[in-house]
Design a protein with these regions (language model features):
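A short SAM/SAH-binding and catalytic strip from SAM-dependent methyltransferases
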Residues: 112-125
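Conserved catalytic/acceptor-binding region of the Class I
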Residues: 144-213, 221, 225
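A short acidic, Gly/Pro-enriched loop at the edge of an enzyme's catalytic core
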Residues: 102-113
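Class I SAM-dependent methyltransferase Rossmann-like catalytic core
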Residues: 4-28
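C-terminal helical/coil "lid" or tail adjacent to the Rossmann-like core of SAM-dependent
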Residues: 12, 18, 201-263
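Class I SAM-dependent methyltransferase SAM/SAH-binding core
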Residues: 8, 45-49, 53-103
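A short glycine-rich, Lys/Arg-flanked "PGG" loop and its adjoining helix->strand segment in the class I
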Residues: 127-142
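Conserved alpha-helix/loop element of class I SAM-dependent methyltransferases that forms part
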Residues: 25-44, 59, 63
Length: 276
């Protein structure tokens, strides 16, 4: 999808309901950005693109204090939640701004580090976004990117409802202009965007039987099919009926109680350095 001037337009597949923000707010800088942390030092200026409710952004601010950290998001509700959390945590070296990763509202060479955590998976033109990220980085600056590789996502037991949800989620992502597989090309895309040097790794997160994450995942599925943006897209495109979506949601509580739950998520982490 695109605007009249050719700029990509995307819809965030998870939406912005309360459950989404609560789920995102569980994430921390130490838990999600281990591949970046060794490169951070006190006093750095950091941009967190697609900051969501701000939990990762706040962690970054605590790590590089007194360096200044900016959280950027396109959705006002996310920014309001982020500001509240920063106030509760009494973190002062941080601010939040509204904006698009395609048109960052900052002069060139403003930041030492830019982060995009589970953000570029949702955009139709990651190359354009990375070129814009590179523009606002200082010489020697570092971009840190993390995104999932959906074809390797695995969850058991593979119920009819779970399999159907996976199909619909992929259809919605692709309809919104995103790619399920772009993450494996991150090094190439970073180089094409003008970064001088890159690194990338694959990792995974276990969602094993008794872990809280495994129990939460089916309930996330339930909330997802009830989320207005997701549901509206599926119904408008004729991919499923109201009854099918309701059946998927209704199956989630029983799935969450299963003793044989198991799954894992594969993701790619990448670093790109600007020439000094």
């Amino acid at each position: 999808m695109a605007t009249s001037d050719g700029a990509p337009v995307e819809r965030y597949v998870h939406g912005y309901e309360d459950w989404t923000r609560e789920w995102m707010a569980r994430r921390t800088a130490s838990g999600e950005l281990g591949f970046l942390l060794p490169h951070l030092v006190s006093g750095m200026a950091i941009l967190d693109c697609g900051c969501g409710p701000g939990s990762i952004t706040i962690g970054l601010a605590e790590i590089v204090a007194p360096g200044q950290v900016v959280g950027l998001d396109i959705e006002p509700r996310q920014l309001e939640a982020a500001k509240r959390l920063a106030s509760e945590r009494a973190v002062s070296n941080i601010r939040f701004e509204q904006g698009s990763v395609y048109e960052l509202p900052f002069p060139g060479a403003t930041f030492d580090v830019a982060v995009a955590h589970f953000v570029l998976e949702h955009v139709s033109d990651p190359l354009r976004a990375l070129r814009e990220i590179r523009r606002v980085l200082r010489p020697g600056g570092l971009a840190a990117i993390k995104d999932p590789y959906y074809p390797a996502f695995t969850f058991r037991p593979e119920t009819t409802e779970l399999r159907r949800f996976g199909e619909l989620a992929g259809m919605v992502r692709r309809h919104n202009g995103a790619s399920d597989t772009y993450a494996v090309n991150l090094r190439a895309v970073l180089l094409e965007a003008g970064f001088e040097r890159t690194e990338a790794q694959a990792g995974f997160e276990n969602l094993a039987g008794n872990d809280e994450a495994a129990r939460v995942l089916p309930m996330m599925l339930q909330n997802q099919v009830r989320e207005p943006a997701f549901r509206e897209t599926v119904l408008e495109q004729g991919w499923a009926t109201e009854a099918e979506l309701d059946a998927i949601a209704a199956a989630a509580p029983e799935l969450a109680r299963r003793e044989d739950l198991f799954g894992f998520v594969v993701f790619v982490t990448a670093l790109g350095w600007v020439a000094k």
